[in-house]
C-alpha cells in the first residue's frame, strides 16, 4: 500500500526467494498482500476523488510535505514524503478530472464503447497494454476511475480495462522471474493466477 506498486513488491519477493531469504508460501503471502494493498489508492480515489474537490487539499499537503521533507528527523521526513506524495496524487486526479470534463465538449470517448465478449477482450487488452507501458496498475486504475466518473467510458468497458490492468501488472513479475530459479518462477505463476482470477 505504501509503495503503490505490486510489480515492485513482486520483483523484490522473487529476488528474496531466489536468494533463499523467504519461502514460496511467504512470497505468495507478500504478493497477495501487495495486490490488496494497491487497491487502497483506487478506493481513496473512488471515495474522495470524484465527490470532493481534492485539489483544495493538495496544495496544503504539498506545502507542508515539502517543509517536512527537509527536516533532519527521519520520522518527520517520512511524513513529509507521504504528504507530498498524496498531494501530488490528489493534484493529478484533479487535473485528470478537469481534462476529462474538457473532453466532453470536443470528444466523446463513449463512441468507442464496444459491448459483449468482443468489447471485453479488446478493453482487457488495452488495460494490459496501458499498465505495461505505465508500469503501474495504480496509475491505470486512476485513469479508468476518473474517465468513468466523468462519463467518458462505459461501466462495462471500465471493468474490462480494470481486469486488463490487474493482469498487466503481472508481466513485470513474469519477466523478472525469467532469470530466477524454480521457486521464483512458481511465485510469478502464482501472481499471474491470483490476478487473472481476482
Residue map of PLM features:
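Membrane-interfacial helix-loop connectors
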Residues: 9-37, 42-55, 131-168, 177-183
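Hydrophobic transmembrane alpha-helical segments of multi-pass transport and channel proteins
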Residues: 40, 166, 170-171, 192-197
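Helix-loop-helix hairpins and the membrane-proximal interhelical loops
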Residues: 82-129, 147
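Membrane-water interface regions at transmembrane-helix termini and the short interhelical loops
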Residues: 45-48, 64-78, 180-182
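Transmembrane alpha-helix interface/packing and boundary motifs in multi-pass membrane proteins
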Residues: 1-3, 125-134
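Membrane-interface segments at loop-to-transmembrane junctions
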Residues: 20, 77-85, 109-118, 131, ...
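Cytoplasmic-side transmembrane-helix entry/capping segments in multi-pass membrane proteins
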Residues: 26-33, 53-59, 77-88, 188-195
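Transmembrane alpha-helical segments of multi-pass small-molecule transport proteins
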Residues: 54-67, 124
Amino acid at each position: 500500500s505504501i509503495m503503490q506498486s505490486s510489480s515492485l513488491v513482486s520483483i523484490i519477493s522473487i529476488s528474496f526467494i531466489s536468494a533463499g531469504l523467504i519461502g514460496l508460501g511467504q512470497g505468495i503471502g507478500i504478493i497477495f498482500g501487495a495486490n490488496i494493498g494497491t487497491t487502497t489508492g483506487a478506493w481513496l480515489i473512488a471515495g474522495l476523488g470524484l465527490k470532493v474537490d481534492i485539489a483544495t487539499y493538495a496544495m496544503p499537503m504539498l506545502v507542508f510535505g515539502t517543509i517536512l521533507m527537509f527536516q533532519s528527523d527521519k520520522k518527520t521526513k517520512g511524513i513529509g514524503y507521504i504528504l507530498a506524495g498524496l498531494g501530488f496524487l490528489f493534484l493529478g486526479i484533479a487535473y485528470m478530472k478537469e481534462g476529462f470534463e474538457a473532453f466532453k465538449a470536443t470528444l466523446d470517448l463513449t463512441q468507442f464503447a464496444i459491448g459483449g465478449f468482443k468489447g471485453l477482450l479488446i478493453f482487457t487488452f488495452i488495460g494490459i497494454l496501458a499498465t505495461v507501458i505505465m508500469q503501474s496498475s495504480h496509475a491505470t486504475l486512476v485513469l479508468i476511475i476518473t474517465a468513468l466518473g466523468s462519463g467518458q467510458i462505459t461501466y462495462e468497458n471500465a471493468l474490462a480495462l480494470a481486469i486488463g490492468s490487474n493482469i498487466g501488472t503481472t508481466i513485470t513479475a513474469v519477466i523478472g522471474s525469467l532469470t530466477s530459479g524454480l521457486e521464483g518462477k512458481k511465485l510469478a505463476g502464482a501472481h499471474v493466477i491470483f490476478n487473472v482470477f481476482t
